[in-house]
Amino acid sequence: MEEFQRYLELDRSRQHDFLYPLLFREYIYALAHDHGLNKSILSENAGYGNKSSSIIVKRLITRMYQQNPLIFSANDSIQNQFFGHNKNLYSQIISEGFAVIVEIPFSLRLVSFLERKEIAKSQNLQSIHSIFPFLEDKFSHLDYVSXVLIPYHIHLEILVQTLRYWVKDASSLHLLRFFLHEYWNTLITPKKYITLFSKGNPRLFLFLYNSHICEYESIFLFLRNKSSHLRSTSSGIFFERIYFYVKIKHFVKVFFDNDFQCILWFFKDPFMHYVKYQGKSILASKXTPLLMNKWKYYLVNLWQYHFYAWFQPGRININQLCXYSLDFLGYRSSVRLNSSVVXXQMLKNLFLINNAMKXFETIVPIIPLIGSLSKANFCNTLGHPISKPTRSDSSDSDIINRFLRICRNLSHYHSGSSKKKSLYRVKYILRLSCVKTLARKHKITIRTFLKKSGSEFLEKFLTEEEVVLSLIFPRTYSTSRRLYXZQSWYLDITSINDLVNYE
């Protein structure tokens, strides 16, 4: 690990030239093991200790360059037992090593960027909930919104060409290109495109996808800055690109035969907000739908002519924000008009003034969440709680703690909901499912189990916030109504709950 850190501190001119030899360094695969693999796949095979993993990688790369990588000599009986039956396994070994190596230039640029801009490292910026305060602040003033599915069926050569701007090591790029064409179907099958963000996908391909999105967003932000009256503020990292302006100028001239700056000035846009999440993006704008249509065809032409990805304009729908709901990150968000009546009196005349204000509202979509609970065997498809099968040696405390952990995690994640009715229903399903599971284990009725457990069992399912507030405030109608509409966004949530990740 220390050797890896020393390598990161080398001069930038040397960093690009010596990535290929890192494939044969032991600590690279130890680092990949710590971040990616669940087990030490190299040490589990007989005859291979930790010190021989670099030898294994050398043989893997040699066989990969051969016409048939699974043809071995008669003296390689032990190796044949390892390689011949584990093609997926050793392709994963190399992919994990590749992932660590190609991330080095990105990590170095990120560190230098943060140091140059004097940006303090903050874990709060990584929270999923940090996006919702931004939406509350901005979206209530906008008029039109469009949800766009970012295409990711990109040709392998496009992915390699994207990395050429970051990795200057020709040997590494050549080996990466050969590896992708050889083992693409082995590592990612067509069915896995649907669950691209699942935990089981190889780290290398998640990195390639993120670099592909970085390429797309760098061009998109460039066009956004050039076509806006205001300077845009972004939380992303914007790096210099080779011949970047020349590429953009050529890209625009494909559609327009005029001066580049004049074209962009014609499309000046006062308000345009962009949000990306889970392979999707949201575009929101103020004023007329003409601006949204302009950016719609900008994106379509960008994907088709720059990334050679077929993108249908009809799949991008432009909707009025006041009559449209956004489903993302486990929430259903919308902008609603809240009317309030204000009584004003002037001399002897009394006036009633009706004020309508836009408010950003977030609720928990109950139907998809019940579908996730049904798949996890907490309830049926109608939302009726059922007993969950458990191991015979599981204790009551283990079962209760498991249900409590799930319930509190969901409450913590959905704490920003403006209406808690759906969340209360989910808590009811989990609480009654826990009761039925324990009653089934002891072979008694639910009524008998609740009599034996008492009220202490139900109080365990209260979250810490509910317990504190119930002690501070009396149980009145106004207090319960206040708790029902209370919103809290936590900045320590860095991953989506498995039950929420139904998209």
Curated annotation (Swiss-Prot):
GO cellular component terms, semicolon-separated: chloroplast
Coarse class of the protein's main subcellular location: plastid
InterPro entries: Domain_X, Maturase_MatK, Maturase_MatK_N
Domain of life from the UniProt record: Eukaryota
GO biological process: mRNA processing; RNA splicing; tRNA processing
Keywords associated with the record: Chloroplast, mRNA processing, Plastid, RNA-binding, tRNA processing
Subcellular compartments: Plastid, Chloroplast
GO molecular function list: RNA binding
Coiled coil: none
Pfam families the record matches: Intron_maturas2, MatK_N
PANTHER family assigned: MATURASE K
Function summary: Usually encoded in the trnK tRNA gene intron. Probably assists in splicing its own and other chloroplast group II introns.
Family: Belongs to the intron maturase 2 family. MatK subfamily.
Name recorded for this polypeptide: Maturase K
Source species of the chain: Backhousia subargentea (Giant ironwood)
Lineage: Eukaryota, Viridiplantae, Streptophyta, Embryophyta, Tracheophyta
Gene that this polypeptide is encoded by: matK
